[in-house]
Amino acid sequence: IYDDVGSINSISFGYYKKLQERGIPCVTFNPFKPLISVVMNNRDHRKIFVVDGYIGFTGGINLADEYINKVKRFGYWKDTGVRIEGEAVWSLTAMFLEMWNYINRSTEDYSRFLPSVYREKEFTSDGFVQPYGDSPLDNENVGENIYLNIINRAKNYVYIFTPYLIIDHEMLICLSNAAKSGVDVRIVTPGVPDKKAVYLLTQSYYEPLLKNGVKIFQYTPGFCLLYTSPSPRDTR
């Protein structure tokens, strides 16, 4: 699955057909139509890579040369990815299949994609890992609600890498209140923008956040596209 608008400048129209001809099932999310419609704003920026149900990768890395700095479009490109093993991988598989069924109007049997062999080492952990997604199919803002909950519970610090600092009033107040309460709130944004309009909008939030004690830094070597953002972290 790839997002049609997100790939519009990098691959040819109808590229999914070429993959299908080579035996690779492929579909596009929300194909672009030259119409004025709010539906066109529904995009899928998730990156999901699952191998045999045992290993999963997610993060901000797309399939493009700038992500390995083979091509420098916006200075040095900094990104991140996470490798997951064990039961948590199933959440990534389920998110993919949910979107696959929606696009194809199909009812793919999820159980077919469960790991066929139980590997005790991979499924033994004293922690809790729960990948989650946020999509137009949801009836609530899953991602934002999780961020708000984490930030509100933080005791020591909240560190955020984000390529686009575009927040609503509730998130602005949440970050400000955390900083005022003594939590060390830091936000890192790109020093080199990939979209100037979005960059200006990002900067418009600097003043109210700084006034309330939030520390803001810019990644001057280039563009930091850590799409796992905001990624608040806290030690207790």
List each language-model region with its residue ranges.
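Helical hairpin unit composed of two closely spaced alpha helices linked by a short loop
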Residues: 164-183
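HKD-type phospholipase D/PLD-like phosphodiesterase module
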Residues: 1-152, 161, 165, 169, ...
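A very general structural signal that marks isolated residues within well-ordered alpha-helical segments
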Residues: 102, 164, 181, 234-235
